[in-house]
Design a protein with these regions (language model features):
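Sec/Tat signal peptide C-region and signal peptidase I cleavage site
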Residues: 20-24
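Extended ligand-binding clefts on enzyme/binding-domain cores
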Residues: 150-154, 160-262, 267-278, 292-318, ...
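Extended ligand-binding groove/face enriched in aromatic
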Residues: 76, 85-198, 203-205, 311
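Bacterial N-terminal signal peptides
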Residues: 8-17
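Bacterial N-terminal signal peptides that target proteins for export
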Residues: 1-9
């Protein structure tokens, strides 16, 4: 029995090693990722990101960070690891959170399935898309609920980028528009945090910095994914993004950061909003739909955020997990540092 167990274990280890070598050969490091790894701060922040215990949306945004960096090896590993936590709806990465939170992993999962041709990943990706299109609870106009019958600013970064990445462009735009019409506060010129559809009113009108960052990041990627024959939709989303960025930048602190409630200087100073907005600006300037004048604000954000990375690679001062009610650390904070750095590196490389 011992000998049999040893043989089985040896064979399994051999197969795993072969599979690992195959993946490594199939996904060589991109020039962008090689450039990022030359920065000690990036390497530390990456290690810290992977050290966190993560819930579904956290796994999702960490996956996006490595997808944005061209680090396919890590994206594929995260996707395969997420298969062990299915939800009752058949979604993966189902560790805590709201109904739509696993959708934040959609882009990475779809990409991993395409790259590896792994049947298990393909099935998981197709199941997630079917859920998003047909089964996720939603309002009468099709806008997907975050939890219960509420719509949150966080969800700008769940279903819309995934739908666009999977080629469902009209549905992605529909989700952005449905969230925008409920959550955009034209008086504050900021995104409110939560809308209660059943009560037809805000359940939280607070312009949370993280929520505005989620919105900017999600809209940015949808714009990037939309093809040329969706120019009218692109123009509409670009206008939303500019309004959002202008509204936030009006409240940027002299140190480059923002308060946790964007328009309330009495709320604590928070790091992640700056990273999220800087990422959005760098990507948008690189994409050509945002003027270079925004780089002044983005560079201040980036400099401030880089100054918040501690010796272990943790980005300090973000709205802390799991309560988000005080400064601390979080997987989101790590992810958006990495995304900001990747977007900045792409912009620098392409403007040399």
């Amino acid at each position: 029995m011992i000998r049999y167990t040893f043989i089985v274990a040896t064979v399994a280890a051999t197969l795993l090693a072969v599979a690992s070598r195959a993946v490594a050969q199939a996904v060589p490091a991109t020039p962008l990722f090689q450039t990022l790894l030359q920065d000690p701060l990036y390497r530390k922040a990456k290690a810290a990101a992977l050290a966190f215990q993560r819930k579904s949306w956290e796994q999702g945004i960490v996956g996006t960070a490595f997808l944005e960096a061209g680090d396919d090896e890590t994206v594929i590993a995260l996707a395969r690891a997420s298969l062990i936590y299915p939800t009752k709806d058949g979604l993966i990465a189902g560790v805590g959170g709201a109904t739509v939170d696993p959708l934040m992993f959609g882009e990475s999962l779809w990409h991993a399935a395409d790259v590896t041709k792994d049947p298990a990943l393909r099935k998981a990706a197709d199941t997630m898309l079917d859920f998003t299109l047909n089964k996720a609870p939603r309002a009468a106009d099709g806008t997907i609920f975050h939890t219960g019958q509420t719509i949150w600013s966080d969800s700008f970064n769940t279903s819309p980028p995934f739908l666009a990445y999977a080629g469902k462009y009209d549905q992605a735009v529909q989700q952005i528009e449905g969230h925008w019409k409920r959550l955009w506060d034209p008086q504050a010129k900021l995104i409110a945090h939560q809308w209660n559809e059943a009560a037809n009113r805000f359940s939280s009108k607070t312009p949370w910095g993280g929520g505005n960052g989620w919105a900017a990041a999600g809209i940015t990627r949808v714009i990037r994914y939309l093809p040329a024959d969706h120019q009218a939709d692109r123009d509409k989303l670009i206008a939303h993004l500019k309004d959002l960025l202008d509204g936030c930048i009006a409240h940027q602190r002299p140190d480059g950061l923002f308060n946790d409630t964007v328009n309330d200087p009495k709320s604590f100073v928070e790091t992640d909003t700056a990273q999220m907005l800087a990422y959005s600006i760098y990507e948008s300037v690189r994409g050509g739909w945002l003027d270079k004048s925004y780089l002044t604000a983005a560079d201040k954000m980036r400099a401030a955020a880089r100054g918040k990375v501690d010796d272990a690679g943790f980005v300090q001062g973000v709205a802390t997990a799991p309560t988000f009610d005080k400064p601390g650390v979080s997987p989101e904070g790590q992810a958006f540092f990495l995304m900001m750095e990747a977007a900045h590196a792409k912009l620098v490389q392409e403007t040399k």
